[in-house]
Curated annotation (Swiss-Prot):
ATP binds at residues 161-216. It is found in: Cytoplasm. Mg(2+) 1 binds at D287, E300. Binds 2 magnesium or manganese ions per subunit. It comes from the Bacteria. The gene is ddl. It comes from Streptococcus pneumoniae serotype 4 (strain ATCC BAA-334 / TIGR4). Its cofactor is Mg(2+); Mn(2+). Belongs to the D-alanine--D-alanine ligase family. It catalyses: 2 D-alanine + ATP = D-alanyl-D-alanine + ADP + phosphate + H(+). Its EC number is 6.3.2.4. This is D-alanine--D-alanine ligase. Mg(2+) 2 binds at E300, N302. Cell wall formation.
Length: 347
């Protein structure tokens, strides 16, 4: 009997378009000799829509439902995703997706799911909290100032100008895929950047800008996590924003990255240490800055990285000899392993 994968995609965050791309890729790459795929779309308003089922490879004409093609007659209760023995693959990015909320819902349903648990998902989603945890693990990061809604913005800007130097980058604490991030060269630009970031979150991070290469490491495993050789994001634009990542195709990837063996070893060790520090499970992608001075800063841990066939995370593992379809199989197996462990603890 074939294993059922419940593919959850879409979602309420600004990264829902990326989720659809990732889900389409998974749907096409699955080994249908082993798996059946059932898909559920989460609309921008948070409704669950039962969409397609695939027992064999979809044709080129098959497309997953999006916010533009919703069939509201197929709206179901969220709990309708439950199926005995099925594994959920929540290909959801950003808030209300990889922040622990969906993970908690799936644990209430007693369903195995791919990826990090409630704690590690919510922790890694918040950039400020992640920085504080990684500081305790002794991992170097770019200098920063945290600003929370209700703070005296003028005083916080003064703190930024005392501790950091322009240019700085302003980021919503709970957001990914470069959404809401701005580069500022002066105080007026910083004020505008803060206004933009606060549109997406009530907690904001201002980081020191660094002249650095962007290097990424893939992580796979539960309690025996393994890492990939690093890959490098090569940009055609000064700032790796959402449009450059997903819409304009202004980036390329160099896999493996052209860096020394010593730097590779440090990055892989730091990535594995960071994954363990947040209690990671299943998968993550760890992003580093590598400066002209040879400094290595851990930028962020992404617990549900972009998962299209051309995304960095699957390509990193392909370089290590694990193909995209085999990577999906491995993640499903890890989901069942972590589910069994979690259930065994409930005595």
């Amino acid at each position: 009997m074939k294993q059922t994968i419940i593919l959850l995609y879409g979602g309420r965050s600004a990264e829902r378009e990326v989720s659809v791309l990732s889900a389409e890729s998974v749907m096409r790459a699955v080994d249908y000799d082993r798996f059946t795929v059932k898909t559920f779309f989460i609309s921008q308003s948070g409704d669950f829509i039962k969409t397609q089922e695939f027992s064999h490879a979809p044709g080129q004409e098959d497309r997953l439902m999006t916010n533009e093609t919703i069939d509201w007659d197929k709206k179901v209760a969220p709990s309708a995703i439950y199926e005995e023995g099925a594994v959920v693959f929540p290909v959801l990015h950003g808030p209300m997706g990889e922040d622990g909320s969906v993970q908690g819902f799936l644990e209430v349903l007693k369903m195995p799911y791919v990826g990090c648990n409630i704690l590690s998902s919510s922790l890694a989603m918040d950039k400020i909290t992640t920085k504080r945890v990684l500081e305790s693990a002794g991992i170097a990061q770019v200098p920063y100032v945290a600003i929370v809604e209700g703070d005296d913005v003028t005083a916080k800007i003064a703190e930024v100008e005392e501790k950091l130097a322009y240019p700085v980058f302003t980021k919503p604490s709970n957001m990914g895929s470069s959404v809401g991030i701005s580069k500022s060269e002066n105080q007026e630009e910083l004020r505008q950047a803060l206004k933009l970031a606060f549109r997406y979150d009530s907690r904001v991070l201002v980081e020191q800008g660094v002249n650095a290469r962007e290097i990424e490491v893939g992580l796979l495993g539960n309690y025996d996590v393994k890492s990939t050789l690093p890959g490098e994001v090569v940009k055609d634009v000064a700032f790796y924003d959402y449009d450059a990542k997903y819409i304009d195709n202004k980036i390329t990837m160099d896999i493996p990255a052209k860096i020394s063996d010593d730097v590779v070893a440090v990055m892989r060790q730091n990535a594995e240490t960071a994954f363990r520090a947040i209690g990671g499970l299943g998968l993550s992608r760890c992003d580093f800055f590598y400066t002209d001075k040879g400094e290595i800063f851990l930028n962020e841990l992404n617990t549900m990285p972009g998962f299209t066939q051309w995304s960095m995370y699957p390509l990193l593992w392909d370089n290590m000899g694990i193909s995209y379809p085999k990577l999906i199989e491995r993640l499903v197996d890890l989901a069942k392993e972590s589910f069994d462990k979690r259930e065994a603890h409930l005595i």
